[in-house]
């Protein structure tokens, strides 16, 4: 009998906890997320010099060394560049 009461109590606590977690995930500010999306550039788009976080995703880094173009553009990162960007803790878009 004690086991059944403890099991029932545990299930109620888990149900309440999972509802609060679901509510927290639903409260993501959509406007803030869209602003962050606009704050980064896709591959082959202009980016901020020296700021790899200005390129979206973990695969994009800012490259300012081009033979035929002036300016800085996002390019696909190599393994070292991905690791370097990961250590910067850039927001994930």
From Swiss-Prot:
Propeptide, chain numbering: 19-38
Posttranslational modification: Contains 5 disulfide bonds.
UniProt keyword annotation of Secreted present: yes
Keywords: Disulfide bond, Secreted, Signal, Toxin
GO cellular component terms, A-Z: extracellular region
GO molecular function terms attached to this record: toxin activity
Superkingdom, natural source: Eukaryota
Tissue-by-tissue expression: Expressed by the venom gland.
Statement: the UniProt record of this protein carries the keyword Transport: no
Disulfide links within the chain: none
Signal sequence coordinates: 1-18
Locations listed in the record: Secreted
Chief location category: secreted
Family of this protein: Belongs to the neurotoxin 31 family.
Protein name: U12-lycotoxin-Ls1e
């Amino acid at each position: 009998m004690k086991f059944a009461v403890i099991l029932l109590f545990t299930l109620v606590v888990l149900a309440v906890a999972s509802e609060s977690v679901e509510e927290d995930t639903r409260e993501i500010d959509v406007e803030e997320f869209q602003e962050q999306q606009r704050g980064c550039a896709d591959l082959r788009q202009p980016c901020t010099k020296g700021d790899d976080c200005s390129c979206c995703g973990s695969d994009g880094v800012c490259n300012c060394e081009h033979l035929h173009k002036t300016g800085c553009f996002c390019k696909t990162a190599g393994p070292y560049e991905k690791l370097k960007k990961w250590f910067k803790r850039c927001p994930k878009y």
